[in-house]
Amino acid sequence: MANSKQAKKRIIQAERNRQHNVARRSMMRTFLKKTAYAIEKGDVEAAKENFAKVVPILDKYASKGLIHKNKAARHKSRLSAKIKALATAA
């Protein structure tokens, strides 16, 4: 357990930041799931709309260190490829 005033403050800050990050990560995953669901249903317009919303979120969280930049790039690349394949098939 923390003994100094500074250590106690850091524990409080760490918990606050953890809760903030959990909420942001959850929001990001929700947007990714919405996009994946639209692709699965075959709805090109909804997929493109959701993809346009999720890309800036991924970029923002990658720049802030919430997720790794390669993870953001991987998600964007895979979703983009699936949407492109869906659009050409339709």
Curated annotation (Swiss-Prot):
One example GO MF annotation: structural constituent of ribosome
Gene assigned in the entry: rpsT
SUPFAM superfamilies linked: Ribosomal protein S20
GO CC, one annotated term: cytosol
Name the UniProt record assigns to this protein: Small ribosomal subunit protein bS20
Gene3D superfamilies: Ribosomal protein S20
Pfam families recorded: Ribosomal_S20p (PF01649)
One GO-annotated biological process of the protein: translation
InterPro entries: Ribosomal_bS20, Ribosomal_bS20_sf
UniProt keywords, alphabetically: Ribonucleoprotein, Ribosomal protein, RNA-binding, rRNA-binding
Function of the molecule: Binds directly to 16S ribosomal RNA.
Lineage: Bacteria, Pseudomonadati, Pseudomonadota, Gammaproteobacteria, Thiotrichales
Family membership noted in the UniProt record: Belongs to the bacterial ribosomal protein bS20 family.
Domain of life of the source: Bacteria
